[in-house]
């Protein structure tokens, strides 16, 4: 049997993780009768992908960073489109990175490409720019959604969309060992552990670290045994390590997910920047306070165009402020300390969050079929429907699968 050929496109680290897991799930489902081509990073390379070019070439930031790299990006756009047309894969699966991926897929449609075009990670039309749903429906065949409430937004405009579950479910966030963490780092069994997560981008880290340090100064007077743990990532590790030296409480900095998830299991509560880590904390059942601070002009624009009331997906999914969000002018040491103190001091407040996030974790797919396997099944189902339609002579130039 001739193996399937799947062309994958990932443009950023989170997409590379999704791509690597999807490739593994496809290989398992097809018992090895599948080949891969496309663009990806180290996780996809581990699964056998030879990337057309370094995935880092597609990293897009602001306008100032984009303009000098525009010739390279246009070259990569041409290169990717040409590679798909030459290889004629059984399907194209693009993963997040919509600025690049959607341009490739639009070019493929204009060139008459007939293979299914599938996009993994639905655009957040429920939060802003709802008109994007109708636009992507013009060139995509299928969407794979991370959140359970997303499919109706796209099905309403005729684009099939499958909820596959959120990748955080496969992160291992709920598999940490708190006792192992305390032993490894010499933390007393009865010490109060607070995980502090100032973010992964330099801009957010530099804005939040001073407030977080001042917050800990307030908490230190109330909790003499307080032990702070600060998981970080390579891009900001040096900045974080330098900042925690002046904090009034002992702080352990960590690199790597395994130690981070053990820290979660050992923690009474967490203080975190808004982002995916809030979902990791939810899966690990760690009560949290979410903080964020951006430029006032950016915030004003955000409030004008964003259609949701919360920044944390837990609150968005529950449609209520279960997890405290302290943003902008509310993101002060006094208010942060008050919110964290409530979690550290009141078991009922912690349990209220744990009960709520347990429901969210179930909605995201925890305890069910792994998201990567669901995604693989959806991709193979789209391909199967296309093959059947081709045999019956019903494929006009694209399918709706």
From Swiss-Prot:
Keywords: Glycosyltransferase, Lipid A biosynthesis, Lipid biosynthesis, Lipid metabolism, Transferase. It is an enzyme of class 2 (transferase). It comes from the Bacteria. GO terms for molecular function: lipid-A-disaccharide synthase activity; phospholipid binding. Its EC number is 2.4.1.182. HAMAP family: LpxB. Belongs to the LpxB family. This is Lipid-A-disaccharide synthase. The lineage of its organism: Bacteria, Pseudomonadati, Pseudomonadota, Alphaproteobacteria, Rhodospirillales. The gene is lpxB.
